Each structure stands twice: as C-alpha cells, then as structure tokens.
C-alpha cells in the first residue's frame, strides 16, 4: 500500500482520516493493556496504538513481535490523544492501528538510535548508516540541502554559470600534498585529484564565461583536525572584469541570503574589514574570533629597560589580560596553560595576578619599576590575570592568539548565538617556510600582487602584498579569494620568485602561461568551505557531523575499511609495486 504521508507530519487536522505510514520502530512498550509503538521516519515520531481487545489477532501478534529498528508498514485511523505530548510535533494525535506488516527485522543496534547518543566516534562511523538515522543528524543534512539550494538560486539569479571541472587533473606543486591516481594507459604517469579547480576556473574566464560557479569536491592529503577532511566541498566562484570590492559584495549577498533562509538571521552589511597585520597583532590569528575581547597588547617598548633579560632582550613582549578570573587559575592550571603555549613555539609563559591591589606572581618583582605604567597600559584591575610571552613577534602572536581562544572556551566567554563575519584583507603575498627554507605562496601562485609592491618580486619578498581577502566567521576561515594574475610576464615573475626555473615553470604551468597569450581578461574569485559553513550554522564543532560519510583523523573510513590493500593484479596493470616501510 502507498504511504500517505510522513509520520512526523501527522497533525490534528488529520483526525478521523485513515492513513498508511512506513518507517522504523523507535520504541515499543506495553502499558495498561495497550501496545504503544513509536514509529520514526525522517520527519519525526508518531505514536501508534494497538488495543488487543478490538484489534485483529494477527495485528496484535505482529505488534508483540516488534523490536527496535524493525521496518514496518502500518495503516490506521488518526485519533486525538487522551493526554497530549507537547514535546512532540505529533503529540496531539496517535494512530489507532488496523493493519500492521513487518517489512524487515533488525539486530540489536550497537547504540541506541536517539540524540545525545553515548558511543565512540569510531563506533558511530563504523555504523554510520545507523548514526544518520538519529533525528539530530537528519536535521544537519536537511540544513545542508537548504544551504546548497539557497546558494544555487542566488548565483543563478546573478547569471553565474554552473560548470563542472575535471576530477582527474595535473599534479602541481605548492600547497598541500596531492592525492595521486596512477594511469593504466600511460604507465608511470599520474593524475592528481584537484585541491581546488583554481586553474580550470581561471581558464573558463579566458573562455569568456564571465561568471562561473560550482559546488565541488576537493581533495588534500594533509593532517586532519575537527574542521578538516581529506575530501571536502567548496562553493567555488570566479568572475571577469570585477574588482575585489564587487566580488566581496556578491559574497556578502550570498551569505546574507543563506543566513536569512536557514537561520532567520538578518546580518548587517557590509561586513567589517580588518587588515592581516591588525588581525595578527591584536588577535594573534589571521581568522580572529571577534565575539569576545581579550586583545593582545604590545609591551616591547615598555619593558625594554627593566632588569629582566627574558623581557628586555626579547624581540617582542606581548600580553593578554584575563579579566576578573585570576582566582580560577591556580599554579597547576597555569602550568597547563604553559604546556599549551609551548605547542606554539613559546619557551614559556610568564604571569602576574592583581591581588589586593598589587601585582603578584613569579615575575612581579621584575616589574616594580613599571608597575604603575603597566597597570595603566593594560587596565589591570582586581582579580585580573596577565599572561606574557617574550619571543619573536610571530611566536608571541601565535601563542597568545591560541591562549586567547583556549581561555575564552574554558571560561565560557563566547556568545554562541552570535555570527560575527569579517573580511581579513591586505595579505602578504608570501610566507616563510622553515621546513622548505624558502618563501611560499600565502594563498597560491596565481594571486595578483598589489601594484605598489610588485617590484619587490625581484627584491624583498616579505614586502610583496596580495590583492587577497579571506572571509572569517567566529574564528574560522570560511573562505578566501583574490584577484588573479592575467598578464604572462607578471605570472612568469611570480613563479620565478617562488623558485621555479623557466623550464620547470613551463613544465608545470605551461598551459596556463600559453593561455595568457590569447587575451586573458582581468578576473578574480573566491571559494567558500561548504562543510565548515554548515557546521557553524548547525552549531557543531566538527565537520564530520555535516558530512554523510566522513573519514576519521587517520583519513580512514571505519565502515568500508578504506583505504585498503588491492590485489597484485590491479597493481601489475598499473605497473606499480608497493614496498611497505615495515617490511
């Protein structure tokens, strides 16, 4: 029999009608001579009632046999409940069962199918198809679908063209490691799964498409954390003939539309803008969380003449003030903060507390000569805790930025109802890599340098600035973009600055450089992390909660056991031989 409707959509207006529902048994219980069954489908729960006194004997027998997660088909009449359950959308009604069929049975599940499940992450991922039955998870994916639907409608209305770009591409250096795919036809050669459609979308601008978008899978072989996965989805945009402000305006409109449609939130436009340098110096992060204060303060000049070499001789001394919470931090808890700080390169963590109107702590005795000025500069008050880092400016910023976020979480200082968007602009073009011993692209090698700094491509690379912009939400990088290079000579200079010889530049990017001989228009774009955006909209702290079949922190899938070994015959066809390190 055809299903009449979803169980979770039955309401008082359906009283007196006969309907057929299909779904899973969430719970069955016997009470007062009646059999109550909670039927669950993707839209919610509906209570079914079997009365042995007037129900068919076969129906009663079937009802008695039901266990959790059995799949059933039920037909009956909608009736008003004697006692309504205000906690359920269907709580005013119940279904008097007239016919009941078991469509499939189920073993006892490894965890209960309900929100707030107590199961390890590995167990949830091993039985992901069960985990996804939970109402909370279903809601996450309804939200995700609504977000993508809204994005497509918005961009379609602005005459963007949805174009699919290749999944099998050329491996190019820079950025994260590629996932490689061996070619059977051209043995010894490899495709790469795209880290982004960067070059192909630029080529679409050269083709005259003018406005492109794609909701696209991307792949990066990098270390994983809560907001990263080896395969992820981004909303990819590229435009011709627009400046950075126009691209940002389009992006803000898109985000405002999504926020209104999915959360009912009206965001204020335009979004605030903050330079990269201000973000690093004041927040210790290029993706600052502006929902709380506790800004970094520079004390380098103030402490340069005190009798404490650790401060006086350090390239930079910076501090944060934890207002009104010194009593919550014992020496033991500060030692934990010190260990945390060392993860970011700091040699240690100095601290003082304001207690009974005076500074107290291990370094307080070295600060007596500047105590009044220090107290005034930092606005230190009773029961404040001050944390100092003395090191290079980079380490001081990074360490205190991480401490700022950690302490805000510990003290519950963050208003999780806020959505604070901002643009981080005026980026450096390059960043120094200690591992590589050279400058690397802060974004990618195709970013346009500012006109007034491009001359430094043959000089001091630290002075080259990029026409680049990142969009940040609540301390997460939501996406980033830039204007792109469209002049061949400038692109060649950029690649040379990154250490490419002319030969290697053409070997890797010859097709792009050749395209620049054929009227490449000015262009720019942006990519937004869809998984991360939906994660934040859903109020989650791990993107696995909004990806249907994610990988764990070892880039493995406990359900399918991917990645897995393959047969020798498959390797032979690819002319590959695998030697494991432990063999």
From Swiss-Prot:
One Pfam family named in its UniProt record: GAD
EC numbers, comma separated: 6.1.1.12
Recorded catalytic activity of this chain's protein: tRNA(Asp) + L-aspartate + ATP = L-aspartyl-tRNA(Asp) + AMP + diphosphate
CDD domains per the UniProt record, alphabetical: AspRS_core (cd00777), EcAspRS_like_N (cd04317)
Annotated positions binding L-aspartate: 174, 220, 443, 484
Gene this chain is encoded by: aspS
Membership in a protein family: Belongs to the class-II aminoacyl-tRNA synthetase family. Type 1 subfamily.
Alphabetical keyword list: Aminoacyl-tRNA synthetase, ATP-binding, Cytoplasm, Ligase, Nucleotide-binding, Protein biosynthesis
Functional note: Catalyzes the attachment of L-aspartate to tRNA(Asp) in a two-step reaction: L-aspartate is first activated by ATP to form Asp-AMP and then transferred to the acceptor end of tRNA(Asp).
Keyword hit for rRNA-binding: no
A cellular component annotation (GO) from this entry: cytoplasm
InterPro entries reported in the protein's UniProt record: Aa-tRNA-synt_II, aa-tRNA-synth_II, aa-tRNA-synth_II/BPL/LPL, Asp-tRNA-ligase_1, Asp-tRNA-ligase_1_N, Asp/Asn-tRNA-synth_IIb, AspRS_core, GAD-like_sf
Protein name: Aspartate--tRNA ligase
SUBUNIT field: Homodimer.
Principal subcellular localisation of the protein: cytoplasm
Aspartate as annotated region, ranges: 198-201
Presence of the UniProt keyword Ribosomal protein in the record: no
Binding residues for ATP: 220-222, 229, 477, 529-532
UniProt subcellular location: Cytoplasm
Molecular function as annotated in GO: aspartate-tRNA ligase activity; ATP binding; catalytic activity, acting on a protein; nucleic acid binding; transferase activity
GO biological process: aspartyl-tRNA aminoacylation
Superkingdom of origin organism: Bacteria
